Regions:
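Acidic, glycine-rich segments characteristic of secretory precursors and extracytoplasmic regions
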Residues: 2, 10, 21-81, 88, ...
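Long, intrinsically disordered, low-complexity segments
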Residues: 21-22, 82, 95-99, 112-113, ...
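An aromatic- and glycine-enriched ligand-binding surface/loop that stacks and positions planar moieties
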Residues: 23-84, 222-403
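Conserved, well-structured interaction surfaces
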Residues: 42-60, 64, 82-158, 172-185, ...
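Short coil/turn linking the two alpha-helices of tandem helical-hairpin repeats
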Residues: 155-156, 160-162, 202, 220-232, ...
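C-terminal substrate/ligand-recognition segments
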Residues: 352-488
């Protein structure tokens, strides 16, 4: 909820036994009896509900946003900065304890239990207070939603976890993990409570609604019946799939897709048009207020997908080009899974051109000339001689050579599987969905964009997958084709047009006055990559025959060795999730729940392939939790710790 203070009265969850840096959001003074009593009042309940929203920000505020969700999968591999390399390579450093400069397993665990503890406190205080006002019932719904959402997040990563459903008044150290089945039961119950209590329409920016609960109910039910749970979920499948589809259809009936896929990423400033789209069901709220610049108070996801450009000729780092953390490098699976002639989503998701912003004393180049270009072409292309070409390729609009061009399939290495550009760890087309040009300086990490937690584009794919699991393949294509219809080029559309959050860098942006240089180009390498004549004709991506899927999908299916109709269609759904949701902090969970993680990582992520094992579809339980809990008043033995650890770890 924007422009509202974030309550400092978070109650530390007792399951977060490891040392947590609470100084960002825990005001020790509020552990006094006076303030505990205040939280029991109806006004205190309202204040505590604000803290629930602060917890949602965590998913965008730190490196865990990508470490837990996008590392070690098919879409991306590790980039030039290896801070989270172990999460991609599954090497010996990746386990219950992660050392070095890297995300730790306990970080997500601890933060989710902090939110759960706040939700537990609010739920108990409302019930004990006997409050029944409309506003307080909505706050109760928010607490049930967050508790269900946080447990869903934990189960998606770790499997069964300890279920804590009441607040703690004294320190507790004796816990055991509930089964995944029991956790799912609780998640469904909490989200159903939220669905009943939350308003149908948000009255405040970013408010949880009935549709948010329905979306995550559908997602939870789909997860419960997925392959990772096949050792116990048989009795749930029929009803869960029916209910999943019902909830998804309800959400779809209430939310329109953005007319143009690029509308989602056309960020021009806080609270701009792209943050108010009807497609967005729920988003963690951020803005340009730096007064609370700690903890979860700003969005850092703009940093992690960006490749190096400051070291290339006639270039230097600037605000719209972003600060290059280069944590995640785009994979060839991602390059090739799109129909790059007819599907606009690749070109609207990735930055393939940047302008000269540092010509120095050059008499040939000036600011605004095309300085860097990534050609994402197809195997067999012979137009470009090398993977990197300096001052060789001519830009047709100016007649000048382009200082730096990288080519996915150069003539001397242009067969499927050659992956020439992966020889460069620092240079690749950056995912541009989260770029933030509204920052104050080139080094500023403080992002201002909202973080999307649910949008109806995904809801369509949830519905499609539910139908695939019911064997209703043609019906599933209907939902997939709706997204593909939006992705196709429309009559008159400029296919080389590109927008991203760099567009927020303009006269009104905080950093514009002192940092006028600008690498932003509202243009992509569509024509240079595809090698076709300019056109404004419409395209079609409609799939009509499940036995004759698009060439991009058939290639993945062959690579993975699928033959059954079900495996082929589930593969299509997962491929479509890449095309629609690439980089949106969901991939690891999707591949883990469908037990396709290992096969896809081995096929499309050569760094992960060497170490990934079948048991790695579950994360290791944090060692800090195992070391901190007790049994019968004593620390756990090594054997007792292993009993609570996931298999293989």
């Amino acid at each position: 909820m924007k422009n509202k203070y974030i309550l400092n009265a978070l109650i530390l969850g007792t399951l977060s036994i490891s040392t947590i840096s609470c100084s960002d959001f825990l005001n020790e003074e509020l552990t006094t009896k006076r303030n505990t009593e205040y939280l029991k009042t109806e006004e205190g309940v309202a204040d505590l509900s604000v803290a629930l929203y602060e917890n949602l920000r965590y998913h965008f505020a730190r490196e865990n946003s990508v470490a837990f969700t996008q590392n070690g999968v098919d879409e991306f591999t590790v980039g030039g900065d290896g801070s989270n390399a172990s999460w991609n390579s599954y090497d010996g450093n990746y386990g219950p304890t992660v050392t070095s400069n890297s995300t730790k397993p306990e970080e997500l665990w601890d933060e989710m239990y902090v939110g759960i503890s706040n939700a537990n406190t609010l739920i108990q205080n409302v019930k004990e207070g006997g409050y029944t006002s409309v506003a307080t019932m909505e706050h109760l719904g928010e607490a049930y939603f967050l508790r269900g959402f946080n447990y869903y997040t934990l189960v998606a990563q770790f499997g069964g976890v300890p279920l804590k459903l009441t607040p703690s008044t004294t320190p507790q150290r004796e816990f055991t993990r509930a089964s995944a089945e029991d956790c799912y039961k609780q998640i469904v119950e909490d989200l159903k409570q939220a669905y009943t209590l939350l308003p149908a329409t948000a009255t405040k920016t970013g408010q949880m609604t009935k549709d948010a609960a329905a979306h995550f109910l559908a997602k939870t039910l789909l997860s419960r019946v997925s392959e990772r749970n096949d050792d116990w979920n048989a009795s749930y499948k029929e009803q869960d799939l029916k209910d999943c589809l019902t909830y998804a259809q309800e959400v779809i009936s209430h939310h329109a897709l953005a007319p143009n896929y690029s509308d989602l990423w056309n960020y021009t400033g806080p609270d701009g048009a792209n943050e108010k789209l009807d497609e967005i069901i729920l988003a963690a709220q951020f803005n340009a207020d730096k007064s609370g610049n700690t903890g979860n108070s700003y969005n850092q996801t703009h940093l992690y997908y960006i490749s190096i450009y400051k070291d290339l000729p006639y270039m230097k780092r600037d605000i719209p080009g972003e600060r290059e953390y280069q944590r995640l490098r785009t994979s060839y699976y991602t390059y090739d899974v799109y129909d790059k002639v007819n599907d606009s989503r690749f070109w609207k998701s990735f930055k393939t051109k940047a302008a000269v912003n540092n010509p120095k004393n050059s008499t040939y180049y000036k600011k605004g000339d095309l300085g860097v270009m990534y050609v994402i072409n197809k195997p067999g292309d012979t137009r470009y001689s090398n993977v990197r070409m300096n001052d060789e390729v001519v830009y047709s609009k100016t007649g000048k050579t382009i200082p730096t061009v990288f080519v996915a399939y150069p003539a001397n290495k242009n067969q499927a599987g050659d992956n020439a550009m992966l020889d460069f760890t620092q240079f690749y087309p950056s995912l541009s969905k989260f770029i933030d040009g509204y920052r104050e300086s080139v080094t500023d990490r403080v992002g201002t964009r909202d973080g999307i937690l649910a949008r109806v584009g995904e809801t369509y794919l949830i519905a499609a997958e539910a139908l695939v699991r019911q064997g209703k393949y043609q019906e599933a294509l209907g939902y997939i084709n709706t997204l593909r219809d939006r992705a196709a080029y429309k009559q008159g559309e400029d296919r080389e047009h590109h927008v991203d959050g760099g567009a927020a860098y303009k006269s009104g942006a905080p950093g514009y006055k002192d940092n006028g240089e600008n690498t932003y180009m509202a243009e992509c390498s569509y024509y240079e990559s595809n090698g076709i004549a300019e056109t404004t004709a419409p395209t079609s991506l409609k799939i009509t025959d499940i036995n004759n899927l698009p060439a991009e999908d058939e290639a993945v299916i062959r690579k993975l060795g699928y033959t059954s109709a079900y495996d082929r269609m589930l593969c299509l759904v997962l491929n479509e999730r890449t095309r629609e949701l690439c980089g949106e902090f969901q991939r690891w969970q999707d591949l883990a729940r469908t037990k396709t993680l290992v096969a896809r990582a081995r096929a499309f992520n050569s760094i992960a392939a060497a170490n990934i094992k079948d048991y790695m579809v579950l994360r290791p339980i944090p060692q800090t939790y195992l070391d901190g809990i007790q049994k019968n008043g004593h620390a756990l033995t090594a054997e007792e710790k292993q009993e609570q650890q996931n298999p293989g770890w």
